[in-house]
């Protein structure tokens, strides 16, 4: 995948992205709704096996700095149905980079891959849900106390999706 937006380049990962990925995955605040912050070894393993070998995620590169500031999980869940997810470097939160990058990937899915649906899920009921709504996704279900957060507390899981005929 190679997509260019006004401020971002969405591309496949390389092993050279390790330090930028560690800045994201090694940050406890970024990872608080997922799992404990990654060690450099765990980041390297995740980058190699999931992002590069499996192609399970793409890099969101900030054009101005050439730095990987986010990763976007993007997987085919079923025929014509894709899951998207994201983690961005905390220094770049609140500036529209996640929206710009995810919107580009969703548009690519519908325009180039003939996707029928793209969905996302989160236990963050505020920030991520707000982004899902901004991306045009609609609520599909809330699973109460479905999973545990990074601190071992039960958390609700929010599922949002967008169908090809309802996209912006």
What are these regions (language model features)?
Residues 29-49:
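Conserved GNAT-fold acetyl-CoA-binding loop/helix
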Residues 48-61, 70:
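A short helix-loop-beta-strand connector motif used in the catalytic cores of GNAT acetyltransferases and
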Residues 40-44, 52-53, 89-91, 121:
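Juxtamembrane/interface motifs at transmembrane-helix termini
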Residues 1-29, 61-168:
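Acyl-donor (CoA/ACP) binding surface of acyl/acetyltransferases
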């Amino acid at each position: 995948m190679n997509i260019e937006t006004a401020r971002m380049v969405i591309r496949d990962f390389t092993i050279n992205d390790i330090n930028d990925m560690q800045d994201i995955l090694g940050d406890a605040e970024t990872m608080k709704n997922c799992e404990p912050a990654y060690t450099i070894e765990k980041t390297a393993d995740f980058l190699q096996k999931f992002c590069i070998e499996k192609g399970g995620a793409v890099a969101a590169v900030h054009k101005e700095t050439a730095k990987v500031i986010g990763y976007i999980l993007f997987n085919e869940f079923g025929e014509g149905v894709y899951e998207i997810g994201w983690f961005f470097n905390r220094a770049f939160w609140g500036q529209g980079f996640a929206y710009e990058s995810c919107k580009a990937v969703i548009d690519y899915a519908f325009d180039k891959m003939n996707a029928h649906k793209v969905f996302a899920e989160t236990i963050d009921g505020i920030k991520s849900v707000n982004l899902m709504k901004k991306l045009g996704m609609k609520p599909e279900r809330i699973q109460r106390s479905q999973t545990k957060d990074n601190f071992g507390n039960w958390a609700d899981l929010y599922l949002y999706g967008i169908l090809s005929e309802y996209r912006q």
